[in-house]
Amino acid sequence: KKTVRENLTFAMRAVGASPREIRKRVPYVLELVGLDQKGDRKPNQLSGGEQQRVAIARALVNNPQMIIADEPTGNLDPMRSLEIMMLLERINELGTTVLVVTHAKELVNRFSKRVVAIENGRIISDETGGYYNNETTI
């Protein structure tokens, strides 16, 4: 198994990043996701929230225009869930489009972002104010 740092390095090498780019970008992303002190650990040595941060870091390390987070808080406690959503918000503020797929209405309602609700494959609401009303089903 690879360490967190090795995982990120592998993701960058896979797309042809130079060693110089890797040396610059990996520490930046580790710091951004709050794992700068845990880069030498293996994912199985980390908590669930930290493992989720590794997944986000791996998605982010090659500086994509967009990341899709499918149920990023699925198995996390409420505090870790909020931390992950705040991290995704920070990533969005830095210029990356973030699409979050979730059933966690209470988490979504804490952020003033666009909310698109889909039911049976159809858009049933598109709210720019970022709030689910009580009638909205997900």
Feature-to-residue mapping (PLM):
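Conserved catalytic motifs of ABC-family nucleotide-binding domains
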Residues: 63
